[in-house]
Amino acid sequence: MKPFATHPDAIPADLQDVMDRLGSVAIEVATRIARGGIDEDLAGLCGTNTDGDGQKALDVIADDAFRAALEGSAVRFYASEEQEEAVTLNEAGTLALAIDPLDGSSNIDTNLSVGTIFAIWPAAATAETSFLRPGSDLIAGGYIIYGPQVCLMVSFGQGTQKYVLDPGSRSFVLVDRAVKVPPASTEFAINASNYRHWSKPIRAYIDDCVAGTEGPRGRNFNMRWLASLVAETHRILARGGVFLYPRDGRKGYEQGRLRYLYECAPIAFVITQAGGGATDGENPILGQTPARLHARTPFIFGSAEKVARITAYHDLPEQETSALFGNRGLFRS
């Protein structure tokens, strides 16, 4: 049985085969993750990728598997976070696919959720022109999360769908055709250990959340941080809230750490199609054009009102983001 045989009408016909191939590999990756430590050490370091990040064995296994599965498909160009350059899979192909084969691999040995993130554009004449374009040109984007359940969240530009893997039939079952980001939540996700490196608007926003009922927001907030983008995204789609990975003052973090092609564009696509918001703190993510395959960007996404509020902090005069929260124009009546 093909992975999406039970709901063929939910996937555009020209993407059905590619989605089946992605789904088949995801099922095998999920099985290997479940057996990790029995047959092989999936968490062992086996090298570094093009940006110098350590590669776990499962990073390489997943990348090889997805690339091999897409040979002979409609995918003309394949760009992976684990590879320096894009490769041509099919000269006659009509699609360009970017992928983070195993997001959150630093969590493998702790048994936290990891995932696969993918983005699909129409193929252009070259790999460069296919991928170095705005996220608004996407025709599909999504992620697979390998957790207590294996789920696929995907958008084809007409809302966001949720599929759950049925282990018995080894197929993905469509459980929600119109996922929506809850508009209200008291949760935010950020790595607070980097507070001293953040810009003033980001500090001001977090300060106001931490101030709780005694601050201008008048309510208590909870902080979350999993260091797994797919897990953070999945929680926000279920419960609302906001995720922040801003730029900061450290060397190499001037544009954040998340990659536009492989992480930010597809996640922003899923979130905005579900009624949420996604920016770099000031401008919409999907309106940006990356300068190179592995370009990074600050990334803030979640419930639309919360993302808009963070953007408003960036619009305040500097003296107000430096002032005590009670004096900020954002909260004046």
Curated annotation (Swiss-Prot):
EC number: 3.1.3.11
InterPro entries for this protein: FBPase_C_dom (IPR044015), FBPase_class-1 (IPR000146), FBPase_N (IPR033391), FBPtase (IPR028343), Fructose_bisphosphatase_AS (IPR020548)
Catalytic activity: beta-D-fructose 1,6-bisphosphate + H2O = beta-D-fructose 6-phosphate + phosphate
Keywords: Calvin cycle, Carbohydrate metabolism, Cytoplasm, Hydrolase, Magnesium, Metal-binding
Pathway the protein contributes to: Carbohydrate biosynthesis; Calvin cycle
GO biological process: fructose 1,6-bisphosphate metabolic process; fructose 6-phosphate metabolic process; fructose metabolic process; gluconeogenesis; reductive pentose-phosphate cycle; sucrose biosynthetic process
Entry annotated with the keyword Magnesium: yes
Signal peptide location: none
Record localization: Cytoplasm
Chain positions recorded as Mg(2+) 1 binding sites: 81, 100, 102
Gene3D superfamilies assigned: 3.40.190.80, Fructose-1,6-Bisphosphatase, subunit A, domain 1
Family of the protein in this entry: Belongs to the FBPase class 1 family.
Subunit note: Homotetramer.
Name the record gives this protein: Fructose-1,6-bisphosphatase class 1 1
Organism: Cereibacter sphaeroides (strain ATCC 17025 / ATH 2.4.3)
Upper taxonomic lineage: Bacteria, Pseudomonadati, Pseudomonadota, Alphaproteobacteria, Rhodobacterales
